[in-house]
């Protein structure tokens, strides 16, 4: 998926609002995903999946930090997320569909916290960006 210059600007703009909330938004995203899509819990059998758990907050922070890093290097998402792609494909063996589910939940969290900023154009750009991230994270499954 090709991101236009406008898409890149929209993504960078929304991530400036997200950057200070990585743990909070990440935890909300994971909790929403686990509730909405219960099979995604199978990858976290050792986690305390209760609301507000330190493990959910910690992993959520890592997830959003990776998205921030990808947004900061939007012209080289593949290079930026290469090690993460290897980890998920070869060691963790996460079902690729879960990246799409996570992206949908992240969009909802962004919409809840920044409704005015998530214009239709920004929404479309962020969705394209999350699809690009998902494509990169699943590229090494092939």
From Swiss-Prot:
Expression (tissue specificity): Red blood cells.
Record's function text: Involved in oxygen transport from the lung to the various peripheral tissues.
Assembly and oligomerization: Heterotetramer of two alpha chains and two beta chains.
Protein name per Swiss-Prot or TrEMBL: Hemoglobin subunit alpha-A
Record-level GO BP terms: hydrogen peroxide catabolic process
Location of the Globin domain: 2-142
Disulfide bond annotation, renumbered to this chain: none
Annotated gene: HBAA
Residues at which O2 binds: 59
Keywords: Heme, Iron, Metal-binding, Oxygen transport, Transport
GO CC aspect terms: blood microparticle; haptoglobin-hemoglobin complex; hemoglobin complex
InterPro entries named in the record: Globin, Globin-like_sf, Globin/Proto, Hemoglobin_a-typ, Hemoglobin_oxygen_transport, Hemoglobin_pi
Binding site for heme b: 88
GO molecular function: haptoglobin binding; heme binding; iron ion binding; organic acid binding; oxygen binding; oxygen carrier activity; peroxidase activity
Family statement: Belongs to the globin family.
